[in-house]
Amino acid sequence: MGKAAVMKKCIRVGDVRKDVREIAEFYFDLDNKTNFTTYSVLCSPLIVSDECIGVIHCLNKKTNNKLFEENDRKLLETLSGPAALAINNAKMAKDLVDKNRMQKEIEIVGEIQKTLLSQNKKENFPIAGINIPAKVVSGDFYNFSELGDGKYGFGVADVSGKGIKSSLLMSKASSLYRCLSKTMYSASELLNLLNSEICETAARGMFVTMLIGIYDSKKKELLLANAGHEPPLIFSKDGKFLNYTEAGPPLGIMSKIKYKETILKFSESSLYIFTDGITEIKDADGNMLESDGFKNYIKKYQHTPNYERLNKIVEDIIKSGRIQKDDLTIVVVDGV
């Protein structure tokens, strides 16, 4: 069989007892192990586009002498072509069905992921978010909610890597955050607990960057804690940008780390939290948008309602001809 596959031609061994010694010894060895007697052999490769996808292997003709003749070789050679095409077409059809089924399953995962993201509230709500996946599923997530007494919680995260593995870790991290953030009002303690859980279960080499916070509209304060996430931008009422750079390592790397939180005065300003898909998106020449480019879009639409503002910013970024290869996620918190 191997010789037929390598040479890509039909081979007949008329009588193994009279043919070349190595072939005879090969079949005699098999016969001794199986109690079968080999008299004659036909092997024809199945060729599609000059590639061997298999071999038809025939033993012993159903005649008295059990020996294949040259006409048998020619017949098998003729039949092998259509057989190869039929087998290849069947395989392609199965692959297409499997691919369509997997694509449908991925789309379902994508739809489930969308339900994990907070929905924007259009009337006087200080927080809005947007997520545009690079593919059907995303490795980014955000969440925000009203905690009561003028307080609002929010979180943005980016899972390392891309694809299904990243989206599954994202789903776990977002579910943990949604559950724990309802009862924990310390940003640092919440990160500590999330980190412990992710360290126990995340696949080796995977991690999550995350920034979480609480906005107190009565005290006009921001409580922030950062686990290796992109430094957020604060756009103040006087038109200047302030950077919050304090951060610990990403979640899932160091199980014993203790995260710190910072309290900032926050009045008549906007906090922009985003993933690196925003600042690292490139134009046709390979130039990244970077922080300065993002700031220009913020300035352009700052006086637009927050949910419209984010849509316009992302729309402009994509319309500028930049090529999206990563998820785009932004959350804005507007201070009163």
Predicted regions span which residues?
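Short alpha-helical interdomain "coupling" segment at the junction between an upstream regulatory sensor module
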Residues: N71, L85-K104
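Amphipathic alpha-helical "output/dimerization" segments
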Residues: V48, K66-N88, S171-S175, S267
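A short, aliphatic-rich beta-strand micro-motif
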Residues: Y39-V48, G54
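… and, occasionally, acidic/histidine-rich disordered N-termini of signaling adaptors
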Residues: V97-Y272, R322-V336
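Acidic/proline- and glycine-rich, intrinsically disordered low-complexity segments
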Residues: M1-R17, Y244-A247
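Short beta-strand-to-loop transition segments that serve as allosteric relay/switch motifs
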Residues: V55-K66, V159, V336
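Signal-transducing coupling segments at domain and membrane junctions
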Residues: G14-S40, K61-K62
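Active-site-proximal, acidic helix/loop segment immediately C-terminal to a metal-coordinating Asp/Glu
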Residues: E69, I164-M184, L242-T245, E268-G321
